[in-house]
């Protein structure tokens, strides 16, 4: 019996013998291919070869590729569906075609794997007579060759565009005793009798985004055989979880949960989900995916949270996914060494994300149960689904899955409406300077909708023509002094806000007027809006104008933008290749860069990043841009942002020869890195789970920042009467002395309050059969007040204690109720809530202890006097 590792090696060796070059698996994150969410097939890394934009070292290649598909996540848990899998494949780039592909496939399955030929059926595309003839040459009888349509036997593209073509599949027949039992049953039947084991794709076309197909430069071959499915067959197992691929991982899940696999369907399903998703998230994180609200990160978050949910159903209340990931790494790192190399990072990321979700899971499940109880009409509202998503971190797919188990559906349209409301709010800070709805209406009626020609890469001043003028009221023919408006030019040197870079400012001048441009916006139709106000005179539509940007401001922006590119390279150099850009803002004053990283950067890491960037600045590296076909840029390894939409031609910005940085970028930059002058990090902070932010300055702003720090240090040194070098030590000594004095003061306060508390005991009175102690205390903080109340409660044994004080110039209340009186209905939280309301504030708490405050300290005594009315 073959092990899965032996099958993998056996396949690759077979095709090496056929002249193929063994190629290592690429990452699950497609290399510079924003058209794909994740790597879905073995041919993804070879797309440039199929498209003819690059040439492989050897036109024959074979690989075992990590793949990930997201279409059936909710189905994972049955016996067949997987998210992450390994795809065995052999590939020809214009070298061999159908004849060799079919002959070698048949040879491998019948001679190397020794699968009986009579157990194998073939499917082909409807009109592929050539393939049918070639299968017959291998000895396959015509009655075991089935013609099927495009849904079954036309493959690709992998994404919304790319190589594709008809295909032919090899199916294994489990026999008539399996499945429907019909005499005419064939691989098109879904009864379970047949299992597809190998797909041979005859790559002939390139399909564009509109669905149009063109012939490729040379017909090629792309085959795919799922290792997991093949292993099931070769090890005679019922499903993949019983094979040696998953058995150790399932065993770990059983060990952690105390459950046994194979006892009942619900337990088996949960064990499969935990095991499969643990494998998937381990590989995703190792390849650089981080949890997020969108894109690849959302897929990862869905899997991780679904695994946690089903872990709870197995009784796993404590974090367990780190242990599961460890089992995955132990099983798979021999084949994929990156798992061991990035083990610490992977486990830290999983621990962090699992802990975050665990904090809200229990409360979220309680809320969901309540929603289920109250739901009428069999449908959970979009509002409720959104609350579970936004507040408790429940992916809507998870809510839908749980609801389905209860016989309910979810209003997904309503959920999407709530999401759009949230997105609109998030965009509100970026709206036009005048009413967005009015602007949208004006844009719709714009008289000039042709794209603005941007000339700002080369020019700071440009002769132009005013094509349109927009105001809050719509389009107008002219504007006068003091009017606020947006001007549309046919040609403009102004960079419009895009890609994180702010828009240019400057002036638009005509013979009759001067317009101050305060911002430049880029509309979806490619038109630039030059927003601002008329300084003097008037401006009219169709007038000749001179557009002049603020050149000094542009140079400052360029320094920061180029520095941002070098910074990204520096972060990957210092922190690791898993670092990904998550956002950036480039202004004249500073730059802001958000990136994926689990923990705060150390001082040493920040220093090394600064040193890297400043070294590249001192080298005065050339900074240059060139336009090229998008596909060529990807082949050259240029960094592209996932989710960004790029045209057929792109602008590549490089720093250095050879390039230190190469990114797709439409922004403005310096011509040599030396123009940046100086780079200085101002701060490094967290902006979310697994997300860090660096704010930095360059040039004059960096000098000003350093001078400010030096001035502050000099002032501090003077106050401490020490040198700059000695100041940190002296400040630490001073802080230690202050902490010691604070503790002494607190001890003294406790002694005084204890004495005061002894006196307060005498003020306790019987009121309606209850011991009641109400008092105002002076010169105590909230902590001391709580200690005093604890002392009084213990001394009284039974009673209600209400204390008040003024702390930080605001009233503060604390109430304690002994257990015997709680049983009689007395509630500390209710009492404090009423007291706080009298003082203009709020508060509450548990029946035994509660605290709260107000805004009006003059109401403190009035509130305390009202206590008896609350008893």
From Swiss-Prot:
Q: Identify the main location.
A: cytoplasm
Q: What is its EC number?
A: 6.1.1.7
Q: Where in the cell is it found?
A: Cytoplasm
Q: Which SMART domains match?
A: tRNA_SAD
The organism sits in which domain of life?
Answer: Bacteria
Enzyme class, spelled out: ligase
Q: How is the cofactor bound?
A: Binds 1 zinc ion per subunit.
Name its co-factor(s): Zn(2+)
Q: Listed GO cellular component terms?
A: cytosol
Which GO BP annotation is one of this protein's? alanyl-tRNA aminoacylation
Query: Which residues lie in coiled coils?
Result: none
Q: Which residues are listed for Zn(2+) binding in this entry?
A: 561, 565, 665, 669
Question: Which keywords describe this protein according to UniProt?
Answer: Aminoacyl-tRNA synthetase, ATP-binding, Cytoplasm, Ligase, Metal-binding, Nucleotide-binding, Protein biosynthesis, RNA-binding, tRNA-binding, Zinc
Question: Which Pfam families does the record associate with it?
Answer: DHHA1, tRNA-synt_2c, tRNA_SAD
Q: Which GO terms describe its molecular function?
A: alanine-tRNA ligase activity; aminoacyl-tRNA deacylase activity; ATP binding; tRNA binding; zinc ion binding
Reactions it catalyzes: tRNA(Ala) + L-alanine + ATP = L-alanyl-tRNA(Ala) + AMP + diphosphate
Report the function annotation for this chain.
Answer: Catalyzes the attachment of alanine to tRNA(Ala) in a two-step reaction: alanine is first activated by ATP to form Ala-AMP and then transferred to the acceptor end of tRNA(Ala). Also edits incorrectly charged Ser-tRNA(Ala) and Gly-tRNA(Ala) via its editing domain.
| Comment on protein domains | Consists of three domains; the N-terminal catalytic domain, the editing domain and the C-terminal C-Ala domain. The editing domain removes incorrectly charged amino acids, while the C-Ala domain, along with tRNA(Ala), serves as a bridge to cooperatively bring together the editing and aminoacylation centers thus stimulating deacylation of misacylated tRNAs.
Family named by the database record: Belongs to the class-II aminoacyl-tRNA synthetase family.
List the NCBIfam families hit by this protein, alphabetically: alaS
Q: Name it.
A: Alanine--tRNA ligase
Q: Which species expresses this protein natively? A: Dehalococcoides mccartyi (strain ATCC BAA-2100 / JCM 16839 / KCTC 5957 / BAV1)
Gene (name only): alaS
């Amino acid at each position: 019996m073959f092990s899965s590792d032996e099958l993998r090696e056996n396949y690759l060796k077979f095709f090496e013998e056929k002249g193929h070059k063994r190629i290592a698996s690429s990452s699950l994150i497609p290399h510079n291919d924003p058209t794909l969410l994740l790597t879905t097939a073995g041919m993804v890394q070879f797309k440039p070869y199929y498209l003819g934009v690059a040439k492989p070292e050897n036109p024959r290649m074979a690989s075992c590729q990590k793949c990930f598909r997201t279409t059936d996540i909710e189905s994972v848990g049955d016996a067949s569906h997987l998210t992450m899998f390994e795809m065995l494949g052999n590939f020809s780039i214009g070298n061999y075609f159908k004849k060799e592909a079919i002959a070698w496939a048949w040879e491998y399955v019948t001679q190397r794997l020794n699968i009986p030929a009579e157990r194998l059926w073939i499917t082909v595309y409807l009109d592929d007579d050539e393939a049918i003839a070639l299968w017959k040459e291998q000895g396959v009888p015509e009655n075991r060759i089935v013609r099927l349509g495009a849904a079954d036997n036309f493959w690709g593209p992998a994404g919304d565009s790319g190589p594709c073509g008809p295909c032919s599949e090899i199916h294994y027949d489990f026999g008539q005793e399996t499945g429907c039992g019909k005499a005419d049953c064939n691989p098109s039947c879904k009864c379970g009798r047949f299992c597809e084991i190998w797909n041979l794709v005859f790559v002939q076309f390139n399909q564009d985004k509109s669905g149009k197909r063109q012939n490729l430069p040379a017909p090629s071959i792309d085959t795919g055989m799922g290792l997991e499915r093949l292993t099931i067959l070769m090890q005679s197992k019922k499903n993949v979880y019983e094979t040696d691929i998953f058995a150790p991982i399932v065993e770990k899940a059983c060990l952690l949960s105390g459950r046994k696999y194979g006892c009942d369907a619900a337990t088996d399903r949960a064990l499969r989900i935990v095991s499969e998703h643990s494998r998937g998230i381990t590989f995703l994180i190792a390849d650089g995916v981080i949890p997020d609200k969108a894109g690849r990160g959302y897929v990862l978050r869905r899997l991780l949270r679904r695994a946690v949910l089903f872990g709870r159903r197995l009784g796993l209340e404590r974090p367990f996914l780190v242990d599961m990931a460890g089992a995955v790494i132990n099983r798979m790192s021999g084949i994929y060494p990156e798992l061991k190399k990035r083990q610490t990072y992977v486990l830290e990321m999983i621990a962090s994300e699992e802990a975050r979700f665990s904090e809200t899971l229990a409360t979220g499940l309680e809320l969901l149960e309540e929603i289920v109880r109250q739901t009428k009409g069999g449908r959970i509202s979009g509002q409720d689904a959104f609350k579970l998503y936004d507040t408790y971190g429940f992916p809507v797919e998870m809510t839908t899955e749980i609801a389905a188990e209860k016989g309910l559906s979810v209003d997904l349209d309503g959920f999407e409406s709530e999401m759009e409301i949230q997105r609109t709010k998030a965009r509100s800070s970026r709206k036009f300077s005048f009413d967005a709805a009015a602007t949208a209406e004006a844009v719709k009626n714009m008289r000039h909708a042709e794209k603005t020609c941007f000339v700002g890469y080369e020019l700071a001043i440009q002769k132009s023509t005013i094509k349109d003028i927009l105001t809050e009221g719509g389009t107008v023919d002219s504007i006068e002094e003091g009017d606020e408006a947006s001007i549309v030019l046919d040609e403009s040197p102004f960079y419009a806000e895009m890609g994180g870079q702010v828009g240019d400012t400057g002036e638009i001048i005509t013979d009759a007027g001067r317009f101050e441009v305060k911002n430049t916006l880029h509309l979806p139709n490619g038109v630039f809006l030059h927003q601002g106000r008329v300084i003097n005179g008037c401006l009219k539509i169709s007038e000749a104008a001179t557009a002049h940007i603020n050149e000094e401001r542009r140079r400052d922006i360029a320094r920061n933008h180029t520095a941002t590119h070098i910074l990204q390279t520096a972060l990957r150099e210092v922190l690791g290749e898993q670092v990904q850009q998550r956002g950036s803002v480039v202004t004249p004053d500073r730059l802001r860069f958000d990136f994926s990283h689990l923990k705060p950067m150390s001082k040493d890491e920040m220093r090394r990043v600064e040193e890297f960037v400043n070294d590249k600045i001192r080298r005065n590296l050339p900074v240059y841009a060139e336009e090229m076909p998008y596909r060529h840029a990807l082949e050259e390894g240029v960094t592209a942002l996932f989710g960004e939409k790029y045209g057929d031609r792109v602008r590549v910005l490089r720093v250095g020869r050879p390039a230190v940085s190469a990114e797709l970028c439409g922004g403005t930059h310096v011509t040599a890195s030396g123009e940046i002058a100086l780079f200085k990090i101002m701060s490094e902070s967290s902006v979310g789970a697994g997300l860090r932010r660096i704010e930095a300055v360059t040039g004059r702003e960096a000098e000003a920042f350093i001078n400010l720090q030096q001035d502050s240090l000099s002032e501090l040194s003077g106050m401490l009467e020490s040198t700059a070098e000695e100041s940190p030590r002296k400040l630490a000594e001073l802080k230690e002395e202050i902490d010691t004095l604070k503790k002494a003061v607190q001890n003294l306060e406790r002694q005084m309050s204890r004495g005061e508390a002894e006196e307060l005991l005498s003020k306790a009175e019987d009121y309606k059969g209850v011991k009641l102690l109400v008092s105002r205390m002076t010169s105590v903080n909230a902590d001391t007040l709580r200690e005093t109340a604890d002392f009084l409660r213990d001394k009284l044994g039974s009673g209600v204690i209400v204390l008040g004080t003024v702390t930080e110039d605001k009233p503060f209340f604390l109430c304690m109720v002994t257990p015997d009186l709680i049983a009689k209905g007395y509630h500390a939280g209710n009492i404090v809530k009423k007291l706080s309301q009298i003082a203009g504030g709020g508060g509450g708490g548990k029946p035994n202890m509660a605290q709260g405050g107000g805004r009006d300290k003059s109401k403190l005594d009035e509130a305390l006097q009202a206590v008896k009315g609350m008893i």
